[in-house]
């Protein structure tokens, strides 16, 4: 089987009008890269059935035996009148739709749980539990509407998933990626990655890629993606030893700044060590707490957070001294330290993260510029760590840089103590 030409299509007039951003395509492309596939093209289409149908026909016409095509489409599987995916695919295939038994059971349970009559809402619900005849069903373990995969001739396939990110990501990881590997993978491909903290793509290119000959050999596929506060470096090769060599190189050169996925690894550490954590946030406005609580099961280790935007909250709830605020200011190493220590007491946790900074665009001074931020990492009965960073970026980016850095700093402390 030849490797397919993969094209990702995102549908939704909210995307083509600019009201929403297409995050699904980049996520899928990154997941595909991790299992050995690259994307040829990204397409965004409005909720226009004729436009969608025309685009699909054009893309399917590109498929040949030596160049098969895999189309991955998200969106348009909901209950509303502008959800056209099922209708378009059935028309493209020349087939009728049929109910998914599993999806029907899920939606009946959904209605029963909420005390609603399924039969009264059947016409609306039926759109969400139907798939094209003779399709491979992708079960939806998070929402209602199933996804599906259809054959469009001998050399083309189309996979459709919901546009809701939480539903799509679960469906892709649990079912669609497995189907792709079984269908198209012809060789074992090894991969690995690292996060490199506070590093730009260009800096990494200069420091590592240009100097490491094995990276630029034909045996390695590498990629770098810039995130808020870090870059994600990935390698793929048929040779496991080569991937391991490059990852070890990164760890040797960048030390503790080279990590696994901190946002996945930190919760594991907290659960494994039975550690509780809380936050004291000023400039990030609760974003660190959001990162924690985005993870299912976070209540086992995350107790809560204090958004101490006002100095009165810093004093009244966190116990920051009035003299500290007067002498050093709200944005200072000293205040970050007392915020972290106050959070330990106020929340009754083992560890705490505090952050205070100047998000801008105003509020800066020659001594304390916009982008300056201080962190405290508190530990019960131990000395509090403090850190200073400078992120001279727009307000929303600054907040993400700061929140991600706070998560990293706690992770780093726990790893050092392990």
Curated annotation (Swiss-Prot):
Q: Which Pfam families match?
A: CinA (PF02464), MoCF_biosynth (PF00994)
Q: What does the similarity note say? A: Belongs to the CinA family.
Tell me the HAMAP family matching this sequence: CinA_B
Protein name in the entry = CinA-like protein
Instruction: Specify the species.
Output: Leptospira interrogans serogroup Icterohaemorrhagiae serovar Lai (strain 56601)
């Amino acid at each position: 089987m030849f490797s397919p030409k993969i094209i990702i299509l995102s549908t939704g007039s909210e995307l083509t009008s600019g009201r929403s951003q297409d995050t699904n395509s980049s996520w899928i492309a990154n997941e595909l890269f991790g299992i050995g596939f690259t994307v040829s093209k990204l397409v965004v289409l409005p909720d226009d059935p004729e436009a969608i149908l025309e685009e699909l026909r054009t893309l399917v016409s590109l498929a040949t035996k030596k160049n098969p095509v895999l189309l991955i489409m998200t969106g348009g599987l909901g209950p509303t009148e502008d959800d056209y995916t099922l209708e378009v695919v059935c028309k493209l295939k020349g087939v009728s739709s049929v109910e998914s038994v599993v999806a029907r059971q899920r939606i009946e349970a959904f209605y029963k749980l909420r005390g609603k009559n399924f039969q009264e809402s059947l016409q609306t619900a039926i759109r969400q539990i139907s798939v094209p005849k003779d399709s491979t069903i992708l079960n939806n373990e998070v929402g209602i509407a199933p996804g599906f995969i259809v054959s469009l001739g001998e050399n083309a396939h189309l996979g459709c998933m919901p546009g809701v990110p939480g539903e799509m990501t679960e469906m892709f990881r649990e079912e669609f990626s497995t189907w792709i590997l079984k269908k198209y993978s012809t060789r074992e491909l090894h991969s690995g990655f690292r996060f490199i903290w506070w590093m730009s793509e260009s800096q990494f290119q200069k420091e590592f890629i240009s100097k490491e000959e094995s990276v630029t050999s034909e045996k390695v596929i590498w990629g770098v993606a810039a995130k808020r506060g870090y870059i994600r470096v990935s390698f793929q090769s048929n040779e496991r030893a080569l991937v391991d060599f490059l990852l070890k190189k990164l760890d040797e050169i960048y030390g503790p700044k080279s990590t696994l996925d901190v946002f996945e690894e930190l919760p594991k550490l907290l659960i494994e060590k039975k550690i509780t954590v809380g936050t004291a946030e000023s400039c990030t406005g609760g974003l660190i707490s959001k990162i924690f609580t985005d993870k299912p099961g976070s209540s086992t280790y995350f107790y809560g957070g204090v958004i101490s935007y006002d100095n009165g909250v810093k004093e009244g709830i966190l116990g920051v001294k009035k003299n500290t605020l007067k002498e050093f200011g709200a944005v200072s190493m000293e205040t970050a330290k007392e915020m972290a220590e106050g959070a330990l007491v106020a929340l009754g946790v083992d560890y705490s993260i505090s952050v205070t900074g100047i998000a801008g665009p105003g509020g800066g001074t020659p001594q304390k510029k916009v982008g300056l931020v201080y962190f405290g990492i508190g530990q019960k009965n131990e000395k509090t760590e403090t850190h200073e960073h400078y992120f001279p970026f727009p307000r929303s980016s600054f907040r993400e840089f700061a929140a991600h850095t706070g998560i990293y700093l706690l992770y780093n402390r726990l790893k050092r103590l392990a």
